From Swiss-Prot:
Protein known as: Serine palmitoyltransferase small subunit B
Source organism per UniProt: Xenopus laevis
Topological domain ranges for the Lumenal compartment: 30-36
Gene Ontology terms describing biological process: ceramide biosynthetic process; endoplasmic reticulum organization; sphingolipid biosynthetic process
Membrane-spanning ranges: 12-29, 37-57
Subunit structure: Component of the serine palmitoyltransferase (SPT) complex, which is composed of SPTLC1, SPTLC2 or SPTLC3 and SPTSSA or SPTSSB. The heterodimer consisting of SPTLC1 and SPTLC2/SPTLC3 forms the catalytic core of the enzyme, while SPTSSA or SPTSSB subunits determine substrate specificity. SPT also interacts with ORMDL proteins, especially ORMDL3, which negatively regulate SPT activity in the presence of ceramides.
The encoding gene: sptssb
Subcellular location: Endoplasmic reticulum membrane
InterPro entries documented for this protein: Ser_palmitoyltrfase_ssu-like
Pfam families: SPT_ssu-like
Keyword entries, A-Z: Endoplasmic reticulum, Lipid metabolism, Membrane, Sphingolipid metabolism, Transmembrane, Transmembrane helix
Cytoplasmic side: 1-11, 58-80
């Protein structure tokens, strides 16, 4: 790919970001605060998803396996 094409594409993505978030009307210092808050919120969502989703999936699998008559843990341990 051409370097100019990549640069144009990234500037177009940044322009789309400014339009979607309406942050093009903010002062530069307001934009930096807004971007910092947005990045912090996104980081917290990703971290929380990484920590809590596997736990909830495991609990849901255990719950539904008990409802639909799955084998108990003691039975599985004896069979292996």
């Amino acid at each position: 790919m051409d370097v100019k094409h990549i640069k144009d594409y990234l500037s177009w993505l940044y322009y789309q970001y400014l339009l979607i978030t309406c942050s093009y009307v903010l002062e530069p210092w307001e934009q930096s605060i807004f971007n910092t808050l947005l990045l912090t919120i996104i980081a917290m969502v990703i971290y929380s998803s990484y920590i809590f989703i596997p736990i909830h999936v495991r609990l849901a699998v255990e719950f539904f396996s008990r409802i639909f008559g799955g084998q108990h843990e003691s039975t599985v341990a004896l069979m292996s």
